């Protein structure tokens, strides 16, 4: 039972029946006023709560207590089950019982005291002032794992079959004691992802009609539900974002929260709700451009770039310098912001030229020069922190490259980040056997060349050593995540088999723990992470 501020709810005596005849005098004390000591009650579905009430005429007796709505009707959803005497005369508890129909309701009712005059047969009703009684029944597909539950209902229960076409829907979040929920709100939803879209458990992109705070994160319309289908630990992305958040030279790291997803009444399993990578004051905080920003300082930013070998950005090109694991030389760049419809030819020419000039200088003879070398074009500190996250987490996608982001603000240098998509092969000797004894991303994209500069290498080593005490706390964080996700994992892996990821990897499982139990997979993840902290400093 939830009580709001105590209020005195006074009532008036109502004569329910009068004969109009002269009646015998009855000196029995009567109830003239009653007050209830709560203005709002929540009743869990199928359960009961106690409502304290006080009869001011302490010597009075009464025969019945009921609940009445406006017009004198008794509600079908709930009733008074019994009356319990209090410690003092005139003080009682009305036990109010939910009818167990499994429906939501929110009613204004009054507590009615019924008195009957034995000598005349007249009935008198005294009512309290109105108070609120409500119940929130669990929606279809309800699941209880200790995590917040995200309910998405598409219009007409329409399936989500496309990564391009949005489906209209409503979204509601049932929170926990620690995390506030979200009332039903309109949205659109579509699929997302590259390889991950083709697995049975789908990832989704949500676009709310109105910006909303979710789990304390900044207001925004766009949110992502990562399926973590192939991740037996359910925490690779979660832990990676935690590590990235420790990097003070990365301007922004997406906030995230594990949730359960119920789609059109069906439980879909454990998901990670995460902020989408977008240009925004509270996300990638760079200058927003217009199609008129084509000359001078205005054309210099901001830009959000993605390096991705899938080559599925609308605006993309390959710069010939640098190394990728897919075909050798050259790095694929794509423009994520400005949007393709808003990007002008002058802006594209500028950012392609900036990347080309940066790479030419980096691979030129004078690249170590602190004023006119690569440091003139790159935010070096961000590139160091970015590399450390990928290397500590054993993520080889930096070298592919896949889901690698950079951004450039107006008048600023090219900056690494944010981190994104850390589920494929993260902390796995299966995908990166070299991690047992060495580095994974020693030559990824531009890092092979950067590490040829002793000043860069010294700075990288010093930064790693500075961060090491923080990085050593991550195994404890993994333990916290394991406790948080245990019940979710039980339900999730009863529905989904991560080993099916082999269908997208030549018949071989990707992370190496897909056939393990949840707890064994977490222990393996933690062990490999600890190994990384031992191996990396020996190679710097």
Q: PLM features: residue spans?
A:
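Middle-to-C-terminal accessory/interaction subdomains
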Residues: 158, 195, 199, 333-400, ...
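Extracellular/luminal low-complexity segments enriched in Ser/Thr/Pro
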Residues: 91-102
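Conserved NTP-binding catalytic cores of kinases and kinase-like/nucleotidyltransferase enzymes
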Residues: 135-239
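Bacterial Sec-dependent N-terminal signal peptides
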Residues: 8, 13-38, 122-140
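Internal "kinase-insert"/substrate-recognition segments embedded within catalytic cores
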Residues: 207-213, 227-229, 249-254, 266-388
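Extracellular acidic, Ser/Thr/Pro-rich low-complexity tracts
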Residues: 55-59
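Short, solvent-exposed loop/linker segments at the N-terminal edge
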Residues: 41-47
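Low-complexity "stalk/linker" and mucin-like segments enriched in Ser/Thr/Pro/Ala/Gly
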Residues: 68-91
């Amino acid at each position: 039972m939830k009580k709001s501020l105590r209020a005195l709810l006074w009532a008036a005596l109502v004569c329910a029946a009068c004969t109009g005849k002269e009646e015998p005098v009855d000196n029995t004390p009567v109830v003239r006023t009653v007050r209830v000591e709560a203005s709002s009650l929540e009743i869990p579905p199928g359960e009961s709560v106690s409502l304290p009430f006080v009869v001011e005429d302490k010597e009075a007796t009464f025969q019945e207590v009921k609940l009445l709505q406006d017009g004198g009707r008794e509600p079908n959803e709930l009733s008074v089950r019994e009356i319990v005497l209090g410690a003092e005369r005139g003080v009682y508890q009305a036990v109010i019982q939910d009818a167990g129909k499994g429906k939501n309701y929110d009613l204004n009712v009054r507590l009615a005291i019924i008195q009957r005059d034995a000598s005349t047969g007249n009935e008198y009703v005294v009512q309290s002032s109105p108070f609120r009684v409500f119940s929130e029944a669990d929606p279809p597909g309800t699941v209880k794992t200790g995590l917040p539950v995200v309910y998405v209902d598409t219009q007409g229960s329409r399936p989500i079959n496309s990564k391009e076409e949005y489906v209209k829907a409503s979204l509601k979040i049932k929170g926990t004691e620690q995390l506030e929920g979200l009332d039903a709100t309109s949205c659109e939803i579509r699929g997302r992802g590259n390889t991950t879209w083709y697995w049975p458990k789908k990832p989704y992109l949500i676009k709310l009609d109105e910006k909303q705070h979710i789990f304390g994160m900044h207001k925004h319309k766009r949110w992502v539900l990562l399926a973590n289908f192939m991740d037996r630990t359910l925490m690779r992305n979660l832990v990676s974002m935690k590590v990235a958040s420790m990097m003070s030279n990365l301007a922004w790291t997406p906030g995230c929260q594990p949730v359960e997803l119920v789609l059109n009444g069906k439980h879909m399993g454990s998901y990670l709700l995460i902020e989408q990578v977008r240009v925004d004051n509270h996300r990638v905080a760079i200058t927003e451009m217009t199609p008129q920003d084509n000359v001078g300082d205005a054309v210099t930013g901001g830009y959000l770039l993605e390096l991705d070998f899938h080559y599925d950005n609308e605006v993309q090109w390959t710069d010939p310098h640098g190394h990728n694991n897919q075909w050798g030389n050259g790095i694929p760049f794509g423009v994520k912001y400005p949007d393709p419809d808003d990007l002008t030819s002058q802006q594209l020419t500028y950012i392609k030229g900036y990347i080309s000039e940066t790479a030419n200088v980096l691979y030129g003879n004078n690249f170590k020069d602190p004023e006119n070398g690569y440091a003139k074009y790159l935010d070096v500190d961000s590139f160091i922190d970015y590399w450390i996250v990928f290397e500590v987490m054993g993520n080889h996608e930096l070298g592919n490259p896949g889901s690698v982001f950079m951004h450039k603000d107006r008048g600023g240098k090219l900056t690494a980040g944010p981190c994104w998509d850390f589920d494929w092969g993260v902390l796995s000797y299966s995908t990166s056997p070299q991690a047992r004894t060495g580095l994974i991303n020693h030559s990824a994209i531009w890092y092979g060349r950067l590490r040829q500069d002793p000043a860069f290498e010294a700075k990288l080593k010093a930064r790693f050593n500075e961060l090491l005490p923080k990085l050593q706390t991550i195994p404890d964080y993994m333990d916290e995540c394991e406790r948080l996700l245990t019940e979710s994992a039980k339900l999730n892996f009863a529905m989904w088999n991560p080993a099916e990821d082999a269908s997208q990897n030549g018949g071989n499982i990707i992370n190496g723990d897909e056939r393990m139990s949840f707890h064994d997979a977490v222990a393996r993840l933690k062990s490999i992470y600890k190994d990384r902290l031992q191996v990396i400093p020996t190679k710097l």
